[in-house]
């Protein structure tokens, strides 16, 4: 049985990944903060390990030796500048700790949950060949996601097989804020307005499966980008998404 170590296991993407790993027969060790709500994660047959990615000692104590795959899902998506210091600590220093611990524990593969935000501000279609400008971005989230990728690339150069995944806007089960909140407002006809624009959306089930596929791809190192552009009237797009969001209507196909 393959073994997985998952950070961010109590979050939206982490819970879906844990569920998919178990469905595919993996043995899961789930890192969680001491203060985290374990109501959802506690339902799954996983090994719960308290710790924090910003605490290297707790990571070393939690991560199994020679684990088949480390899934670094934990991340700070804050867009409030007053919390930039914490975001930098968690996204950059936390990723550095995960990479260094994975190397020390001889992990066979690492998969990083990054974001298309790590490409910065771009025009046109994004591909894996697109050059990021996020390192100079005034948006701390963009910059720290790119810097987190840099930590993984350092790990690759040090001999750690790793893959970076760049999903767009993730929607699906276990989301209790973000897009889910927007969809509920639309479903209740309480959305006051919507600006024109587009969003690249991907279902969380596909994101979870992509992580596992990346971990099973042997020594392959690279970036997998998910982007599904939507266009047209923004309120219409939001209504379509709301009608198919789990908990509101028919679940989106995974």
Model regions: which residues?
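Conserved catalytic-site region of short-chain dehydrogenase/reductase
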Residues: 79, 116-125, 170-176
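NAD(P)H-binding glycine-rich loop region in Rossmannoid oxidoreductase-like domains
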Residues: 40-93, 101
């Amino acid at each position: 049985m393959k073994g997985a170590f998952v950070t961010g296991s109590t979050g939206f993407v982490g819970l879906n990944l844990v569920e998919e790993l178990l469905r595919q027969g993996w043995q899961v060790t789930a890192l969680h903060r001491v203060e985290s709500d374990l109501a959802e994660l506690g339902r799954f047959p996983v090994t719960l390990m308290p710790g924090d990615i910003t605490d290297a000692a707790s990571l070393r104590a939690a991560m199994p030796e020679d684990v088949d795959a480390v899934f670094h899902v934990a991340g700070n998506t804050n867009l409030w500048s007053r919390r930039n210091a914490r975001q930098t600590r968690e996204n950059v220093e936390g990723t550095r700790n995960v990479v260094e611990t994975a190397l020390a524990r001889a992990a066979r593969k690492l998969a990083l949950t990054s974001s298309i935000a790590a490409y910065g501000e771009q025009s046109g279609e994004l591909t894996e060949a697109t050059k990021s400008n996020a390192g100079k971005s005034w948006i701390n989230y963009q910059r720290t996601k790119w810097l987190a990728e840099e930590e993984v690339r350092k790990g690759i150069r040090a001999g750690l097989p790793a893959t970076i995944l760049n999903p767009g806007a993730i929607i699906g089960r276990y989301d209790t804020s973000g897009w889910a909140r927007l969809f509920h407002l639309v479903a209740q006809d309480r959305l006051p307005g919507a600006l024109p624009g587009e969003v690249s959306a991907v279902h969380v089930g596909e994101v979870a499966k992509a992580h596992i596929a990346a971990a099973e791809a042997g020594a392959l190192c690279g970036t997998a980008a998910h982007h599904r552009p939507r266009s047209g009237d923004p309120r219409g797009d939001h209504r379509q998404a709301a009608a198919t969001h789990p908990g509101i209507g028919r679940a989106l196909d995974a």
